[in-house]
């Protein structure tokens, strides 16, 4: 069967220009114009999808089959093209009959051309073929427009849904252009959307804004750049310049008697030889041979000298910002206000992850573990599920940390920061687990953060963490924070 893409090529139809017109028409729609004015950051993210739209339309053209009537007419057109002038004049009436049978739009014009020009000269035959080609191009272009209008309506409907969702959440997630782009990408994964989904995200976003200290704490943790020091003895010798005292010829004091030709420092006995005629020539011989007895004067000077010595280096490398693994305690003691704080803190870290293009994985732990990948293509759906999760059950912190340690040994998460949000009222950790975590910290330099929502966390548990961030959720602290606001 003949496809639209094939007939475009055979008729030399500019398929790319037709697709370009569809995209321009789509972007000029009033709905998009209003949205772009309101959310300029999301506009840039949306425009990045243009290439994918074009590619999708091209694939659709390749897959769409030409109707049988047009395909048969095109086959007849190709046969007629190859006829010589004499044969064409013999078969032109049969060609007209077949065009009538195919109900071709070219029939009326073909009939007029035959009446006017029969028998056809070679030039008139070429005109007939050319007019027929124009008729076929018009029919195929009409097919394109019908197909593209249908695709445009579907694409616009999808865009309107994504725009509505992204627009409602832009104040929550569009911290920068990268975050806006990630939000736009995730909106594609939302197949079904209800007002309740947006409402719960907005509710926790509002709660986070009402707790500026919690928001600041999340920002400090998420943006922290802890340096890792790797002391290492260097086997390389480095050159250094030292200043030392060394003998010099600068005349400072008499240091003895020597042989030279320095007349200014002659001993009186040598000078006496010059006044005796018999030994005058002996004086000149000693002068030439530098054998005259003279005073030796010498001083000290400070001189620079380069020496080599071994040096010990301490390499301080800035810790790269890796993904987040957020572990949230969902035990019964974490209910109520603690639950709100934990979920809002997770939302804040997700916002930072989107802005910094980092992965964000949430693990809820109590007697069982539930995983949510908040930075995936369906991250918004995962976020809604996470925020709807209820907190109940016991606290199995050991199983959670064991799974985190295993996850940090995988290539995807080897540079991740582990964040545990809990009241840390739990059982003691096994010694083998503590050693396992220390090994990960020492060998891979992963950071373990503890966000404690209570003042009653066990010190034996807290000591395994690199950083401890405290946010007291007690009634007294809550009232003090509200009073400060």
UniProtKB/Swiss-Prot annotation:
Name its cellular compartments: Cytoplasm
- What InterPro entries does the entry give? Uncharacterised_CoxE, Uncharacterised_ViaA, VWF_A, vWFA_dom_sf
Q: Does the keyword Nucleotide-binding apply?
A: no
According to the UniProt record, one GO cellular component term is:
cytosol
Pfam families, alphabetized: VWA_CoxE
Keywords noted in UniProt = Chaperone, Cytoplasm
Question: What CDD domains does its record include?
Answer: VWA_YIEM_type (cd01462)
Summarize subunit and interaction data from the UniProt record for this chain.
Homodimer. Interacts with RavA.
Write out the function statement from the record.
Component of the RavA-ViaA chaperone complex, which may act on the membrane to optimize the function of some of the respiratory chains. ViaA stimulates the ATPase activity of RavA.
NCBIfam families documented for this protein:
PRK10997.1
Q: Which family does the similarity line name?
A: Belongs to the ViaA family.
State what protein this is by name. Regulatory protein ViaA
The source organism is Proteus mirabilis (strain HI4320)
Question: What is the phylogenetic placement of the source species in the record?
Answer: Bacteria, Pseudomonadati, Pseudomonadota, Gammaproteobacteria, Enterobacterales
């Amino acid at each position: 069967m003949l496809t639209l893409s094939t007939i475009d090529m055979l008729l030399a139809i500019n398929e790319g220009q037709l697709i370009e017109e569809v995209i321009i028409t789509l972007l000029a729609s009033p709905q998009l114009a209003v949205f772009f004015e309101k959310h300029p950051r999301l506009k840039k993210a949306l425009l990045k999808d243009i290439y994918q739209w074009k590619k999708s339309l091209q694939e659709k053209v390749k897959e769409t089959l030409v109707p049988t009537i047009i395909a048969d007419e095109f086959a007849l057109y190709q046969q007629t093209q190859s006829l010589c002038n004499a044969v064409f004049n013999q078969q032109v009436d049969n060609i007209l009959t077949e065009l009538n049978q195919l109900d071709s739009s070219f029939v009326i014009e073909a009939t007029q051309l035959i009446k006017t020009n029969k028998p056809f000269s070679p030039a008139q035959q070429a005109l007939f073929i050319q007019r027929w080609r124009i008729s076929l191009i018009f029919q195929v272009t009409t097919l394109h427009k019908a197909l593209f209008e249908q695709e445009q309506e579907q694409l616009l409907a999808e865009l309107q849904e994504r725009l509505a969702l992204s627009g409602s959440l832009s104040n929550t997630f569009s911290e920068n252009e990268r975050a806006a782009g990630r939000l736009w990408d995730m909106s594609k994964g939302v197949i079904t959307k209800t007002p309740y989904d947006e409402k719960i995200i907005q509710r926790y976003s509002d709660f986070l804004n009402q707790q500026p200290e919690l928001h600041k704490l999340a920002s400090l943790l998420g943006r922290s750049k802890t340096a890792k020091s790797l002391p290492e003895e260097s086997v390389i010798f480095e050159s250094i310049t030292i200043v030392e005292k060394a003998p010099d010829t600068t005349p400072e004091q008499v240091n003895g008697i020597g042989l030279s030709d320095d007349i200014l420092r002659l001993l009186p006995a040598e000078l006496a030889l010059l006044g005796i005629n018999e030994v005058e020539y002996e004086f000149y011989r000693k002068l030439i041979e530098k054998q005259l007895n003279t005073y030796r004067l010498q001083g000290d000077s400070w001189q620079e000298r380069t020496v080599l010595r071994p040096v010990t280096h301490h390499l301080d490398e800035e810790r790269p910002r890796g993904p987040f693994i957020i572990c949230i305690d969902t035990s019964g003691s974490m209910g109520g206000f603690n639950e709100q704080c934990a979920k809002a803190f997770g939302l804040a870290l997700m916002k930072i992850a989107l802005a910094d293009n980092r992965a964000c994985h949430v693990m809820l732990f109590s007697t069982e573990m539930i995983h949510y990948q908040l930075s995936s293509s369906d991250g918004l759906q995962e976020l809604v599920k996470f925020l709807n999760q209820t907190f109940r059950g016991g606290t199995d912190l050991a199983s959670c940390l064991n799974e985190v340690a295993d996850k940090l040994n995988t290539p995807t998460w080897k540079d991740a920061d582990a964040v545990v949000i809990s009241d840390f009222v739990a059982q003691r950790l096994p010694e083998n687990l503590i050693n396992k975590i220390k090994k990960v910290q020492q060998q891979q330099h992963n950071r373990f953060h503890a966000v404690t929502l209570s003042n009653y966390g066990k010190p034996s548990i807290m000591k395994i963490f690199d950083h401890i961030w405290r946010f007291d959720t007690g009634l007294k602290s809550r009232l003090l924070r509200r009073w400060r606001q």
